[in-house]
Each structure stands twice: as structure tokens, then as C-alpha cells.
Amino acid sequence: MTRKMKYLKGSLFFFAITLTLSACSVHKRMARQVNKQFEKSQVVSQYHVGFALYDPADQQLIYGKNQDTYFTPASNTKLFTFYAGLKMVPDSLPSLRYVEHGDSLIFWGTGDPSLLHTGLKNVKALEFLKNSGKKLYFAPGRYSGNFYGNGWAWDDYNDYYQAEINELPLMDNMLLVESQAGKLRISPAALRSCVSLDTSDRTTAFRVVRDFNQNLFKYPNTAVPATYNQQVPFKTSTILTINLLSDTLKKPVGLIRMTMPENAKTLYGIKSDSVFKAMMLPSDNFIAEQLLLVYSDRISADLNTTKAISYIKDKYLSKLPGNASWVDGSGLSRGNLFTPREMVSLLDSIYVTVHNNQRLFDMLPAGGKSGTLRNAYPKTDNPFVFGKTGSLSNVHNQSGYVLTKKGKVYLYAFMNNNFVLPTAAVRAEMARIVTYIHEQF
């Protein structure tokens, strides 16, 4: 090796060491300043709080507070579901599996939530069935789970955020009831006869309530408000699926008991990114749960949430620090438990996988602009926070990406559990500290 080469090698080594020491110095200063924000906070001192701030460029945790303690993540769980989708269905969602036998077309569900979804309006699979020219037969039995996820609150069965899970969902698995000229407009039409007046109910608050075990919907004997709009989960069943399909396709759909063969073809439908965005921006629990069944379709003849999660953890999350407890797709279950360090590690994996900030941030709520972060930060056309919120009773979290005035991108997880303060106070304190990071670094 010549003297010149030795000199260059030594210079490069010295330069690398200098950069490393410089980054460490900056990170230590940041850690001290962020820690001061927590120390002076009169809000976070009142409950169980966890925080992690991570630099993806240097792959270093800058600051942590209870970063290895487990928290109930609520809808931050959807970040796990999102990452799994980026890996398992990177382009389009499988809508149906099918085989053709003579004059018959036999099909199986994949869990695809976009079929006749009110927002996504995916009709590709329905057009395929309608135009097939063959006799149609639906083969149920792929889904081997319950209609609710592990650990869900069953008394929320009438609320829009807790639709049932099944293998061939249609129309969000939801009854839509709206006011129209003083009367009720009901969709899907196949369930109109299931909605009736309860003459004995004279409560002032107008609300449609379903019987827990069956599709019997009652509304009170009061005037329908002019702006009334309600979504009520309907009770899923194979018979209802067939009726909804037949009514939509305007042709009969038969029922057949048949195990899906290995050579069953796949009909792909809507682009995955549009489904991820529809899940992440409004925090759609229905889409999140159904996506786990879609992922299960990619690895098994059975549609099973537990098997899908186990596969994803082994194949894509094996390097995640800690031992995350992940039990559903949406975060409705309190059985989910993640640490702030695990959350920023996951965010880093998402960041690396997408490798395109414009594409990634378009699929996430933006602080002050869109989704569940729209009202968490001041209104703006130039958001600096992109991420996911998560809320249950006494739980409010936020994990995502913060862009700083100096042009840096940092990953953060802010987890707040077991508080009795108003959620608005917790939300405002998170915004204050994250905004401080944006402005100072």
C-alpha cells in the first residue's frame, strides 16, 4: 500500500469517526432537551407514559422514556397490519378464489373488505361474477374464527366501529340508515324488511338498535331528525351473503359445500395502497380486521387471524425488539401490548419498505390536514407530522414521523395509558412536545 493510499484511508476513517461523534453529540443534546419537556410537563406526570424518538438516518434511538415498557396501543396496532400488507399484498388485493367446472363457477371469499365498500367501491369481483355466463356457487367455510376478535367488547355490537368479521364481506358488513324527506332510507335493500318501528320506545334520542343475535332492527317512536345518519353492523351469515350477492348481481347464487382446491385461481381487485389509505386515515377497524384474513389467504387454505399474525411475526418481525403481544388487526382488543421501542422499530421497517416519503405520507393521517390527526395539530397545508393515533377508554397514543425545520425525519412513539384526564388534554400535550421537536431540531 502506497503512502498516499494509507493517508487517504486514514483520512476517511478519521472523517467517519468525526461524523459518528458529531451525531452522538447532537443526539445527546436532543435527548437532554426533549427530556426537559417531559420533566416540566404537568400533564404526563399524572399517568403512565412512554416515549421513543428514533433517527432512521443514523439508526439510533435518540431518547426514550419507559421505552421498553408495554402499553395498550389501541389503533396504533393498525401500523402492524399496514406493514404486513406492504409485505404480503404489495400490489393488489385478492378478491376471490374460484374454479370452473363445466357450466358452473364455484368461488370462495378471501376476506377482501373492498367488495361494495362505501368508500372504496370495488366492483371488479362482482362484475366478474355477473359477466361469467356460468351458474354461480358460493362455497363457504374458509374462515375459522369468531365474528369478533380476541378480547373485543361485545356490548359495542351496535356501534359502527365494530363490524363483524367474515370471509366474504359486502357493503362494509353494515346497515346504513339515513334520513330522506322525513323517512328512513335503508341500505342494503335486502335488509329493509328487518327494520321496524318500536311503538313502545319514546326516547328523545333517535337511534336504531339491532338485536344482538339476529338482524332485527328497531327505531323509536319519534320524528326522524333531518340530518340523521347511522351505520349499524349487521349480523353476518352465509344465507345473508348469498342474498346480498343475488340481489346485487340480479342473478341466482347457489350454495355448495366444497373445500377449496390447491389449483383454485385468484381474481385480483383493487390496488393495495388505496385500501391501506382507507384503513389508516379514518382508522377503519373493519378494513384492518379483514386485511388479516386477506393475508391469511396468501399462506393457507384457511382464513385464520391467529395463523396470519404468527406467520407475519416469524417472517417479517423477527428482529423487532421485545416480545410484542399482537392479537387483532384493528387494536380494539386490550390484549395487544407494544413498547415505544417496538413501535419506532416498526415505523423504521415501514419507512425502509416504502422508501418513498410522498407515497408513505399519502397513506397516513397528516397533522392539521387529514385523517385522525387533522384536529390534533393547527390547520395547515404543510403538515410536519404523519402517523397513526390510537384511542380506547383511558388510552390515547400517537406514533409516526415528524419532519423538522432543519430537514430531518425522525420517528416517534408517544404512548399514554391509564389516565383520567380529558383526552383533549393528553392530545394537546403530545402535540406540544412533537411540535417542539419539529421546531428545534
Regions found by a protein language model. Name each.
Residues 57-59, 69-72, 111-115, 142-145, ...:
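Solvent-exposed loop/turn segments at secondary-structure junctions
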Residues 71-85:
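Active/ligand-binding-proximal structured segments within catalytic/core domains
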Residues 1-37:
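Bacterial Sec-dependent N-terminal signal peptides
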Residues 51-53, 97-99, 399-400:
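Short beta-strand scaffold segments in enzyme catalytic cores
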Residues 59, 78-82, 168, 245, ...:
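Residue-level preference for non-acidic, small/hydrophobic
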Residues 62-64, 292-441:
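Small-residue-rich helix-loop
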Residues 24-70, 89-92, 129-134:
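Beta-lactamase-like hydrolase cores
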Residues 87-322, 440:
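Conserved serine DD-peptidase/penicillin-binding transpeptidase domain
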